[in-house]
Amino acid sequence: MKLVVGLGNPGKQYETTKHNIGFMVIDAIADSVPHTPWKEEQRAEVCSITVDGEKVLLVKPQTFMNASGESVGPLMRYYKIDPSDVYCIYDDMDLPVGKLRIRPNGSSGGHNGIKSLISHIGTENFPRFRVGIGRPLPQWTVIDHVLAPFSEESQEKVQKGIKDTVKAVLGTLEVGIDKGMNQFNPKRRPQR
């Protein structure tokens, strides 16, 4: 069994914010494959899908971003899921809007939702699907940026990023994180 966790904030007022790209991807995965009804469990919205014969829980913590681990840690322990089987999808300001980067582990990179997961899971060794939201405008704070909706002109890139991430998550669930990174991470151009 695996957990696929999308990070975000609960509530209508946050639905379309950049910080909620993880929730958007989870919803898009659920829209693309058959799933069980959503239910409330361990302070999260949870449903399950089957990928390649394996049960996969789709998870949207309802604890607010900075406390996401308070939901994910207990779910992981209840279902006896190894950290390497907890796939986390979240926003990344260091990537251009809609771009995807998959990593097998790593530090929080200053992301408070990931800090919370690391704290409650007890390790940095869980796969990440980082979805780009771009950098804030010069006059904006980081908080203003992540809690604002995507601009109208970036919607095409956002939708492509969500679609690409859905494909990458489902594909990686089938082939594993190493092959998934090779298959779905952007290819590096050769140095000249």
Predicted regions and their residues:
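Nucleotide and nucleotide-moiety/phosphate-recognizing core
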Residues: K2-N105, K115-F129, P136-T141, E156-R192
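Conserved TIR/SEFIR loop-to-helix hotspot centered on a Trp-containing motif
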Residues: S108
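Active-site proximal helix-loop segment of RNase H-like, two-metal nucleases, encompassing DDE(D)
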Residues: D144
